[in-house]
């Protein structure tokens, strides 16, 4: 069989199982109201939790950064590509998100995927046992695999099982890895207990706060700040293309950890540094997130979350008990989930259908992502659409 034939057969199998993914093309900036594939829609698909992606101040900051630093970085961070914008952002991030450890330092990455791979592969290896939550993000899973550590998966948020696994381990180095907010369920990891176990067993606790940074905690400083945790065992990873509205990611930890990443993290060392203008814009975003406007946006978002929770409970399907901006509604079968998403789309509502392998088989769902850019009228539209579909399904 020709190589292309093998791929064609594989794609047919994906189609037969209702699992083909398709990209959609946005013709306008990321916002609550967009033009996608030439049609006006209300979007419930993005991770723009604070509605900052099209904020005029950030657009201006991107332009200012490009004028000041140019279109590209020109090299890796260690070979000419580390600009003043990158350095300033790392200082800003350490101050904003590093309150959980003394002598905090931050390291800026081009993507959250790279930050997760870099951290796990630099800190874990042969002789390390890595304890990973069963529902961790794909980038954490891949980082664990690439680290060559012994990887043990503990049941989702089950700290009793994790405790037993730690007790049974004689590894030289132990690393606990977890999302803070789980991206497909919206629930929050038991961070205080995870840190307690990490300190009890002399382990690192690495948390991916991709969906918590900017939204949770005082001034949006993240899930660790919300839980009021402090420890040199903690390492926090956050993304800057979600609530922050721009792009990139960062790791915050004790300065010694960050210096180790600079020296040993291959995804940091062997890649061109991100566009300096983006770093300049993220610094502007942090000022919004941590200020009065950020507080107001989070308060509005919380109102939307509470209303959506009540709305989903009134449907014939299974809502996940999420108190975050990620509001899943489990439908079950792939085809049924796709049909509901398509019906909502025809009504001008973009609510993505999430299917295996992203979520377990039999738990295909609508993933409703809320943003401070949404209005109550937007939720009126969503509620009406779900009510009509629910009446047909009942």
UniProtKB/Swiss-Prot annotation:
UniProt pathway: Cofactor biosynthesis; biotin biosynthesis
Q: Which residues bind substrate?
A: 21, 137, 358
Name the catalysed reactions: 6-carboxyhexanoyl-[ACP] + L-alanine + H(+) = (8S)-8-amino-7-oxononanoate + holo-[ACP] + CO2
- Top-rank EC class of the record's enzyme: transferase
Q: Which GO terms describe its biological process?
A: biotin biosynthetic process
**Per the entry, which co-factors are needed?**
pyridoxal 5'-phosphate
Residues with the modification N6-(pyridoxal phosphate)lysine, per the entry, are 242
List the Gene3D superfamilies: Aspartate Aminotransferase, domain 1 (3.90.1150.10), Type I PLP-dependent aspartate aminotransferase-like (Major domain) (3.40.640.10)
Assigned keywords, A-Z: Biotin biosynthesis, Pyridoxal phosphate, Transferase
Positions of pyridoxal 5'-phosphate binding: 112-113, 183, 211, 239
Q: Does the keyword Glycoprotein apply?
A: no
Q: What is its EC number?
A: 2.3.1.47
Q: Which family does it belong to?
A: Belongs to the class-II pyridoxal-phosphate-dependent aminotransferase family. BioF subfamily.
List, alphabetically, the NCBIfam families matched.
bioF
* Function, in words: Catalyzes the decarboxylative condensation of pimeloyl-[acyl-carrier protein] and L-alanine to produce 8-amino-7-oxononanoate (AON), [acyl-carrier protein], and carbon dioxide.
Q: How does it assemble?
A: Homodimer.
Q: What is this protein called?
A: 8-amino-7-oxononanoate synthase
Whichever gene encodes this chain, its name is bioF
């Amino acid at each position: 069989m020709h190589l292309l034939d093998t791929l064609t057969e594989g794609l047919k199998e994906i189609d037969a199982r209702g699992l083909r993914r398709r990209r959609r093309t946005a013709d306008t900036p990321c916002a609550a109201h967009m033009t996608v594939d030439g049609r006006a829609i209300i979007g419930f698909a993005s991770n723009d939790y604070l509605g900052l992606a099209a904020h005029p101040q950030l657009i201006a900051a991107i332009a200012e950064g490009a004028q000041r630093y140019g279109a590209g970085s020109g090299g890796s961070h260690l070979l000419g590509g580390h600009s003043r914008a990158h350095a300033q952002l790392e200082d800003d991030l350490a101050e904003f998100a590093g309150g959980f450890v003394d002598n905090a330092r931050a390291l800026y990455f081009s993507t959250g995927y790279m930050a997760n791979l870099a951290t796990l592969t630099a800190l874990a290896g042969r002789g390390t046992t890595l304890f990973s939550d069963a529902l961790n993000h794909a980038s954490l899973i891949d980082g664990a695999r690439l680290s060559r550590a012994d990887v043990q998966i503990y049941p989702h948020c089950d700290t009793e099982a994790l405790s037993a696994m730690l007790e049974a381990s004689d590894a030289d180095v132990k690393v606990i890895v977890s999302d803070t907010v789980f991206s497909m369920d919206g629930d929050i990891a038991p961070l205080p207990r995870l840190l307690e176990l990490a300190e009890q067993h002399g382990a690192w606790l690495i948390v991916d706060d991709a969906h918590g940074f900017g939204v949770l905690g005082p001034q949006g400083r993240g899930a660790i700040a919300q839980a009021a945790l402090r420890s040199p065992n903690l390492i926090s990873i956050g993304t800057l293309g979600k609530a922050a509205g721009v792009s990139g990611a960062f790791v915050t930890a004790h300065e010694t950890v960050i210096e180790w990443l600079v020296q040993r993290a291959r995804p940091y060392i062997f890649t061109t540094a991100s566009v300096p203008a983006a770093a300049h814009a993220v610094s502007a975003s942090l000022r919004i997130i941590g200020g009065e406007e950020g507080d107001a946006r989070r308060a509005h978002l919380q109102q939307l979350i509470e209303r959506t929770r009540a709305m989903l409970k009134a449907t014939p399907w299974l809502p996940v008990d999420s108190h975050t901006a990620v509001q899943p509604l489990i439908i079950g079968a792939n085809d049924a989930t796709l049909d509901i998403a398509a019906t909502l789309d025809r009504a001008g509502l973009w609510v993505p259908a999430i299917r295996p392998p992203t979520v377990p088989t039999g738990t295909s769902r609508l993933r409703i992502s809320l943003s401070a850019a949404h209005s109550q009228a937007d939720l009126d539209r969503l509620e009406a659409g779900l009510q009509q579909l629910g009446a047909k399904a009942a």
